Every structure is written in structure tokens, then in C-alpha cells.
Amino acid sequence: MSQLRLLPSRLGVQAARLLAAHDVPVFGWRSRSSGPPATFPSSKGGGGSSYMEEMYFAWLENPQSVHKSWDSFFREASEEAFSGSAQPRPPSVVHESRSAVSSRTKTSKLVEDHLAVQSLIRAYQIRGHHVAQLDPLGILDADLDSFVPSDLITTIDKLAFYDLQEADLDKEFQLPTTTFIGGSENTLSLREIIRRLENTYCQHIGLEFMFINDVEQCQWIRQKFETPGVMQFSSEEKRTLLARLVRSMRFEDFLARKWSSEKRFGLEGCEVMIPALKTIIDKSSEMGIENVILGMPHRGRLNVLANVIRKDLEQIFCQFDPKLEAADEGSGDVKYHLGMYHERINRVTNRNITLSLVANPSHLEAVDPVVQGKTKAEQFYRGDAQGKKVMSILVHGDAAFAGQGVVYETFHLSDLPSYTTNGTVHVVVNNQIGFTTDPRMARSSPYPTDVARVVNAPIFHVNADDPEAVIYVCSVAAEWRNTFNKDVVVDLVCYRRRGHNEMDEPMFTQPLMYKQIHRQVPVLKKYADKLIAEGTVTLQEFEEEIAKYDRICEEAYGRSKDKKILHIKHWLDSPWPGFFNVDGEPKSMTCPATGIPEDMLTHIGSVASSVPLEDFKIHTGLSRILRGRADMTKNRTVDWALAEYMAFGSLLKEGIHVRLSGQDVERGTFSHRHHVLHDQEVDRRTCVPMNHLWPDQAPYTVCNSSLSEYGVLGFELGYAMASPNALVLWEAQFGDFHNTAQCIIDQFISTGQAKWVRHNGIVLLLPHGMEGMGPEHSSARPERFLQMSNDDSDAYPAFTKDFEVSQLYDCNWIVVNCSTPANYFHVLRRQILLPFRKPLIIFTPKSLLRHPEAKSSFDQMVSGTSFQRVIPEDGAAARAPEQVQRLIFCTGKVYYDLVKERSSQDLEEKVAITRLEQISPFPFDLIKQEAEKYPGAELAWCQEEHKNMGYYDYISPRFMTILRRARPIWYVGRDPAAAPATGNRNTHLVSLKKFLDTAFNLQAFEGKTF
């Protein structure tokens, strides 16, 4: 028996040629009806021999359990393996007569030939795309490599690779179950096999899918592309495709004629993208999709707005008129960044469909996670857990798709439970150039689409000058997404007829490419000639179609001349019906009190300190935390975590969906939140008590994110776009790390309303505080947020009745640094109770989470209470303000350091401390009151951050404005520095003591000039 166990390795000697380089599908031992066949991987990893062992041991048990060809193969091989051996042959091996030797040799040859053919088929399935004719210009291989895989039969002599000869070309071979090239036939000649493989894998479509580790999915793709005759189109479908190409090309031609010197980033060279997108939408609509959310860069955007979203042409043409005055607030944006929302009938399916094109900046690919977040939210509000009603399409450029890291971050959100959108169709406009950069200098991978392999997304490369191939690929892509709820990539290999923009000269850097482009016949003419030649349309019908669309454009151009005002709100990508009045203004300019009834506080506190599920064992450390919450609730106090719990819980009671996302937010970076409880005895059994507060509450979502800031913050921003009736929060692990999402903050959050008239109520929770933890765990960079705040430091405001709310409405975002749990509770609730939405930036504490003094009473949170923009001094100094020698203004955690130091120096009557809770927009009215309350006091601003950071540069000119420059505001804090904080604990404490000494040295500023 030991000899038998060695036999597979001896068999491998005979089969080595067939197994050495490829995965070889199983030959004919399972019927087509029995499901996908087994396969075994390359022998380099040992998988080939493992498979052969399985087959061999199955044969040992029962020779009839394997195909007869394997039976013959093993019989012959076992005889050879034991030839010359003194040991007896195994009883399971039947002796054959000498006359059968010739038959055995023929059988062995037959098996080897069939295995060779299967290897050949698999070679085309894996590597055929390398030699596909993808470049419309015929210059480059799309994979940047002219190497032709040795196992593809590009010439007759390549047959020798498989030990086949030219004489074998007309032999019939049994087809394996891993191919559909035979259609209804089970055998084909080798010549026909190669021809069909060439037609499927090496023409205008290149398929990358064999890396997918799911046999069913691979079989699905093979069937869609290999089955003979699958790419057949009716005359009506061809005419529709031609009409869409006409619209795509003539739109660009019209803009070029009317505004030849304007930048528009036209689609010339990839006009087929318009029918491609429309096909994806048509097919998806047919399968039940009702809402499609698109994201794309500038290239071809106006064409998509006109011919896919169906924006009124006159409104597009108005964007080219420099004399029109913008009617809406804000600064606006260039025309090729604008978004759009439109509900219409899909004429192909006669079904309603909503199309949204999300506005985006010039920062390529930044819109990707935003689109995904908006899509996820729309699915959530519709109860569309499987993504059968709402989907997303992302259009990319080849250079950006390969070069921008946010693409990778977004892909890795695609299958996370709280972030999946159940599949996205990605369309890459691969014009084989990035501005002036050659692809060889722009990426290290063969294709720009290789990043999609990380999520097992199939990649369909297609020559954009073959419109029918493009349309078929897009139809399959839509079906794939609907069938498997996974991402798919369509790579439109095309060219860029003009420079990067219409004013750019590409011949400087790509002379040979552009010489070929100038000779290139436009795809519309190519396809029209084809249809005319085959009789699908006549020349007259084609010319009439062109004239018809030209007339539509001219008429719209005429109407655009009558426009007097440019309305940015016509380009809103995420309207909130019913939230604003008909003019898009808030329905009021007031905000109700944010406190809640005490019985609600008590109820939420009770749930927060318990486990709603039976037989659920929690960690003993967590039990102590819950007991602590119960004690606080009993004593009518809250700490930071409990205040947050009560804010969230009360909003859920009011029907407001709350979503908290970020790294480690379920537990909390500082182990303070614990919104998800884990059973200590049952793996993966969890409980979210917040979802057990009320029978009819809104759902609460708390989800740990991937270790990404850029992608995840963009996702949450998009999520917040979908509805104003949700509190969407993103928490950084430490505030320092938000700068890896700086693009989202700069291009979307701080400027989104000004550019795109888009309100957004996203909340950023940024842990911040100087505690000796080093330069990367200390600062959320408040100075940067304040620098981007748009309130005027030099304008003395008019203190009207609605000043507080009007000031919030006029700002671009709200920046706060709360020093009490109660104020944190109120600012979260105010975010929803305001009659409009603004981004909210909160610098949250770390050490204050457990600080014994950082607690609030229920009295500060009950009905009738509200957020305090400024918390004034309420101690001895406030009772005798005329005796106060110094009034210190501060914000955040440093307040507790100041109070402790003041107490140690017994200066409660001489030094008053006022906390600035809302930093921007600046509370001019309350600061004025506080300063006037202490007329004889020096004014000082104290911060724990370095002087060139923190808040001083922001507050100083505003103090000067409100005080009419009558009194200086002195600086107390750390000296200027390059790094936000020291990494040395001792240095931290020394610098802390130094500025605290200055704060309470009442002679510190004598003799100094401001």
C-alpha cells in the first residue's frame, strides 16, 4: 500500500507538462447538469498534485467513480510505476493482456491531448485579455506590455507548447464543463475551439475574472461571453445606439462651435460613454432599480448632464454666459463641477427613475466615497437592504483610478456590513493619458483597473470604438451587479481627441499619439457607416437624426439668451423636499430649547446602565461602568458618555435616525462609550441597548469603520446629504488624524454650501487636548478649522432679536469646544432642532471623560435649558466684578487646569474665568457683555496650545472689534512651535506650569505694549 501512496507523485512525472504552468479544469468526470466542476490550481503551489491524489484515491476505492479516461490513465500509469518492482501489484489493479498495450498507449495520448485542450481553454480565459485589440488607436497594448503569453495560440508553432500538432487542428475534442464556447455542442475541432476562444477573449473585449474565487461567478461570466451568438442586437437596439451616439457627439460639437475658447473638458474620443451609461441605467431600471446616484470627474460631465440626467440644455448653456448674475447665496462653482437631481420616465422601460449626479471638486476621485454614502443612506431610508431599488455608478479617469488612494479606501468599504451599497458599477474612461503623463509613468500595474482585484470585482476591458461591444459589456455589468450584489468595472479604452482641456496643446508631449488621433475616424462615422452598409439605417435617416438634435441645441441656445439670472439652486444634487420653504429658505429663524423632560433623562439613563437581553454575560469591567451610570442617573448627574447617550436617545425618541461611525467608535477609543455590548460566552453575539429605548424609536447605527479617514469621512458626508432628519457623526480616533481626510473637509464640508448651495449637518467629533501624549495624539488643529470659518473678524454685528440663529445660518460651519457634558448634550440636540443644517465641528475631550469635576446635573439638561455659547464666571469673582483684576477667557479642558491653579493661589475673587464654548461663529454679543461686566479687569486669552496654533489668532481680532480696540486681549499659553505637542512628559508639565504661572501673575503684563 505504501507503493500505492507514492503513485500520485510518479503519475505527476507523466502529467508534468500539462500541470506545470496552469490551472487545469477537470476533464469530463461531471455532467454539465451537476453544477460547476472542480478545478485545481497551478502545480507551483502544490494544488495540481493534491487534485490528482484525490482523483487517484477515489479511483482506488472504486474505479467506476471517475471518468473512464481517468480509469485508463491510472491503470496504465500504475503498471509503469510498478514495472521492474519485485513487489506484487496491488489487487485493485487489473492485469491486462499484452494485446492491450497499444490500446493503453492510445488512451494515454487521448487523455493527455484532452488535458492539453483544457489547459489551452483556461489559458485564454486567464490571459486572453493581454492580446485583446483594445486600443482604438492601435498604438498600445492596454496592459502596457507587448509580451504575448506563450500559452496562447497566436501562431501555429505555439501548438507545440501543448504537445499538439497542426494535424490535430481538425480533431474533435470533448469540451470541459468550464467553457460555453460549444453552445449546445459538447465537442468541437481544435481549430474551431481556438477560433471561438480568439473571438471571445482576444478581440475588442478583454476579460479579467479568473482571479475570482467563486466558481459560480466565474461560470456566470463565461456563459455571458463565451456562448456563441450572445452579442446579437436587434435593428431597433442598433438604431437607439446610433441615436445616442449622435447626441453625444453633436452636443460636444455644438459647444465647440459656440464657445470654442471655453474650458468644458469634452468627451471627444470617448463619446460612447453616453450610451454606455444609459445602457447601465436602462438595464438596471429593467431589473427594478428606481434611484441611480452617479459620481464622476470633469471629463464629459456636461454631456452626461445633458444626455443622461437630461438637464435642460438652456440651463447648461447659461453657464457659458459670463454676464449672467448669480441669484443664490454663495460663490458657486465652475460648470463642470455642478451636480443635478432629476426624476423622469425611463423611455426604454417606461418606469420612473431618479437620477442624481453628485457635485464634486477638481480633486479627482474625492467624490467616490461621498456617492457611496449617499447611496447607502437612500437604501437605508427605503428599507432597501439588498440594493434592489437604489444603486451607484462611479465614472473614473484611468490615471486617477490608478493613482488616488481614496479609490482603494472606497473599494474596501464595498463589503463592510455598515457601508456596503450592494455593488457599484465602475466605468473607467481610459484615454491612456493623464493630462500630459504617459501611463507608463503613471502606474506600476499593467492596467489602471488592477485596484479592483482586491475585492474580486470582474474587470471588463472594451475598445471604445466598438459601440456594440461596449453596450453588451455594460449590459452584462448591470446584470452582474443585480445578480451578485458586487462591484464590477468597465474599462472603456479610448483616446482624448483634444488636450487636457480645450485650450491645451497635447502635441508638446504626445506627438505620435496625437498624429494618430488626428487621423482617427470618429466613432459615430464608423458606426453609422456600418449600419448603413448592413441596411439597418439609411444615410438620409442618419442625417435627419443629426439635424434633429442640432435643431434641439439651437433652440435651447436661443432660449438661454433670454435668461437674466443664474440660479445655482437649479443644480442641487440632494434636495430635501419640505424642509425649507418654496424659496429654499428656512421656515423660521428660531431654535427651540434643547432640554428634555427629566423622566426621559431618567429612562435613558436606566437603559444605558442595563443589558436589555436575557442570558447575556458582559465583561466584569463593563459591569462596573454600567453600575457607575446607574449611580449617576440616581444622583441626577451625567458624565460625558452618559450625556451623549441621552442626546442620542432623546433624538431617537423624536424619530431622528442617529448614525455614529469611525474607528473603534462602538467601544470608544478611550473605552468610555460601550454602545455595543459583547457576550463574553457566545462569539459574535452583541447587543446595542440604544435600540431598546422606545417601541417606536428611530434606528440607531453605531459602526466601527475601516482604518480609513478620507474614505470613511467622505462616506458619512454623503450619508448626511440624503436627509436633514438624521444626526450623522464621524469620530476620529484622535483629532490629529482628521488631516488624512483633509480633502473632504476642505472641498466638501467647509465649502459645500458656498459652491453648491448644499446644506449638510454632519458632525465631526475630534478628540483634542494637550496631555503629554506626543505630537500625533494631542491636537485636532483647531486653528485650521477657524481659519476656514467665514465670519468677518472686522465687522461689528447688529445684535438683532434672532442674532444667535441668524449668525449660525450665515456661517459655513459651527466650531465648538464644550467644557461640560450638559453643553455637549445640548449642542448635539441643537444640530437637529435648528431650521437649517450646518456642519458641526466638536473638539471633544480625552481626560475630561473621567474627570471628577467634568460632570453635569440634570438641572442643566431638563426642559427649558439650552446650549450655552459662553459659560460665564459664577463664583466669587462674579459676585464682586468691580474687584476683579483679570478676566481670563478660555475654551475646553484648560478651564479645569485654570480653576485648580486659581484655587491653589487663592485668587477666586481677583481672577474671573469665562469659557468660550462656541468659538465660531464668534459670540460677539456675549463676549461684549462679559467684558463690560468687569470694567477694571485686564483681559487675557488662555489656551494650552502653542501660540501659532489653537484659537488666539482667530479670537484676537474679534475681541478688538467688539471692544472697539479700547482694551487689549493678552495671550497666555505655550510659545510658538513647529510640532503641536511635546512627546516628553516632563517637558509637557514644565510648559503647563509656566503658562499657568503667567495666567495668575497679576503683574505679568505691566509695562508691555499690545
Swiss-Prot record:
Function: 2-oxoglutarate dehydrogenase (E1-like) component of the 2-oxoglutarate dehydrogenase multienzyme complex (OGDHC) which mediates the decarboxylation of alpha-ketoglutarate in the tricarboxylic acid cycle. The OGDHC complex catalyzes the overall conversion of 2-oxoglutarate to succinyl-CoA and CO(2) while reducing NAD(+) to NADH. The OGDHC complex is mainly active in the mitochondrion. Involved in the inhibition of cell proliferation and in apoptosis.
Pfam families named among the record's database cross-references: 2-oxogl_dehyd_N, E1_dh, OxoGdeHyase_C, Transket_pyr
Metal-binding as UniProt keyword: yes
Disease with which this protein is associated in UniProt: Yoon-Bellen neurodevelopmental syndrome: An autosomal recessive disorder characterized by global developmental delay, and variably impaired intellectual development. Additional variable features may include hypotonia, spasticity, ataxia, hearing loss, visual problems, seizures, and non-specific anomalies on brain imaging.
Binding site residues for thiamine diphosphate: R299, D398, N431, I433, Q663
Positions annotated to bind Ca(2+): H130, D143, D145
Family the entry assigns: Belongs to the alpha-ketoglutarate dehydrogenase family.
Tissue expression notes: Expressed in the brain and the liver.
Region described as Disordered: 81-100
Known catalytic reactions: N(6)-[(R)-lipoyl]-L-lysyl-[protein] + 2-oxoglutarate + H(+) = N(6)-[(R)-S(8)-succinyldihydrolipoyl]-L-lysyl-[protein] + CO2
Compartments where located: Mitochondrion matrix
Gene that encodes it: OGDHL
Cofactor dependence: thiamine diphosphate; Mg(2+)
Protein name per the record: 2-oxoglutarate dehydrogenase-like, mitochondrial
A GO molecular-function descriptor: thiamine pyrophosphate binding
Inducers of expression: Post-transcriptionally repressed by microRNA miR-214 in cancer cells.
Ubl conjugation found in the keyword field: no
Outcome when changing D491V: In YOBELN; uncertain significance
GO biological process: 2-oxoglutarate metabolic process; glycolytic process; tricarboxylic acid cycle
Record CDD domains: TPP_E1_OGDC_like (cd02016)
EC number(s) from the headed UniProt entry: 1.2.4.2
UniProt: Mg(2+) binding residues: D398, N431, I433
Effect in UniProt of substituting P852A: In YOBELN; uncertain significance
Keyword vocabulary terms for this entry: Calcium, Disease variant, Glycolysis, Intellectual disability, Magnesium, Metal-binding, Mitochondrion, Oxidoreductase, Thiamine pyrophosphate, Transit peptide
